[in-house]
């Protein structure tokens, strides 16, 4: 009879070059293990894409299946689905245990095999669903559950030199995408065609710089006219017209790390009302970048940009907060909410944090200068200020195009 195991090892092929060195992953795990010890936890079950990637390098593709990274004082084990075969083991730091599809809940049987019963378990309350929490209790019968979401987020907010080096590459690749957009803009071109040109340029550059990586998720949002009113509006087939406001957004993804460039442009011509709004948003952007200093809170930076917009009678057109952290994140995983430029975030900026400044004004159709105006740069907080990592210029001098 054909064996139908609940879980097994697939060590297929040779382990790949990981995004970071073994010493980098060990340093991250050391901090996590210290956090577990401080909270009297014997094991962590990390289930989010961002935390698994952060602590071991493996970025999973769920497709409806659960994944985990189990960290104890002695072990680091990825729990992966059989559909992926040997790829998770090749792409992770530590060991990998694969569960089969022969019966439901083999994932939890594999977790139980590593952890056992009655332990103090750390988990991610902001990621593990209520249904999966119930299964955790059934299969592991933990003596206690401890939420690790906030502690792991705080750790990710502080970037290592190796992470900063990768983010620098990402910002440079985003600039390449920006120039590709600028060069592709012409009357009658569709948003989708311009976006594809920039995406292809970035993916080729990522492959050149990181020949041992896996390539996934790099994208471009390129919006025109009415479509610029929202920062996250999808690309469409709208064709560009003279005088259109444009929103350029390039997002290279490198080993699960997100970077971005965002700029306002106009097609061939800009009217005086639009130019006034554009210049005001650029001024707010420059003010905001100057406020990003060590020792200053996110709330204080936000208040400073708010005051500027209020003085210019524009605050009512603000769309969202003024910036956020960078690292292991994308539009569908990894938000670091403790490092966002919002009124209710009191986090104090410290050297090694990486954060954006990205003010946006949206004026609805019918008002003079209607459209969405946004500038976005990535900044590294340093000992004596900040360093802007994007180099593509902002403002009217370069960005009236086509």
Give the label of every model feature segment.
Residues 1-402:
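Active-site neighborhoods and metal-handling regions in enzymes and metal-associated proteins
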């Amino acid at each position: 009879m054909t064996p139908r195991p609940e879980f097994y090892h697939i060590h297929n092929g040779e382990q790949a070059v990981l995004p970071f060195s073994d010493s980098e992953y060990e340093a991250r795990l050391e901090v996590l293990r210290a956090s577990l010890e401080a909270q009297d936890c014997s094991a962590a079950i990390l289930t989010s894409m961002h935390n698994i990637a952060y602590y071991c390098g493996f970025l999973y593709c769920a497709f409806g299946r659960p994944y985990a990274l189990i960290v104890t004082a002695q072990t680091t084990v990825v729990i992966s689905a059989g559909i992926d075969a040997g790829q998770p083991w090749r792409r992770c730091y530590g060991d990998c245990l694969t569960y089969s599809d022969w019966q439901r809940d083999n994932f939890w049987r594999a977790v139980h095999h590593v952890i056992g019963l009655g332990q103090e378990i750390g988990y991610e309350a902001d990621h593990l669903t209520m249904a999966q929490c119930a299964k955790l209790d059934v299969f592991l019968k933990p003596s206690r559950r401890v939420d690790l979401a906030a502690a792991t987020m705080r750790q990710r907010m502080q970037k290592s030199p190796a992470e900063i080096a990768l983010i620098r590459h990402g910002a440079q690749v985003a600039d390449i995408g920006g120039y590709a957009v600028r060069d592709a803009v012409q009357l009658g071109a569709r948003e989708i065609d311009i976006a594809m040109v920039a995406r292809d340029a970035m993916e080729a550059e990522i492959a050149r710089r990181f020949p041992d990586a896996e390539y996934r998720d790099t994208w471009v949002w390129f919006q025109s006219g009415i479509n610029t009113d929202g920062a996250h509006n999808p690309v469409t087939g709208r064709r560009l017209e003279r005088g259109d406001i444009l929103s350029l957004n390039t997002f290279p993804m490198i080993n699960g790390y997100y970077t971005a460039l965002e700029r306002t442009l106009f097609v061939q011509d800009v009217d005086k009302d639009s130019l006034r709004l554009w210049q005001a948003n650029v001024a707010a952007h420059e003010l905001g970048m100057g406020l990003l200093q060590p020792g200053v809170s996110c709330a204080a930076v936000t208040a400073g940009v708010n005051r500027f917009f209020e003085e210019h009678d524009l605050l009512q057109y603000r769309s969202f907060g003024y910036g956020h952290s960078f690292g292991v994140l994308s539009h569908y995983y990894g938000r670091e909410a403790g490092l966002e430029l919002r009124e209710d975030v009191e986090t104090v900026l410290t050297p090694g944090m990486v954060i954006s400044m990205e003010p946006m004004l949206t004026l609805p159709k019918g008002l003079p200068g209607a459209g969405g105006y946004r500038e976005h740069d990535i900044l590294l907080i340093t000992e004596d200020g900040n360093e802007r990592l994007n180099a593509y210029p902002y403002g009217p001098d370069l960005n009236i195009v086509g």
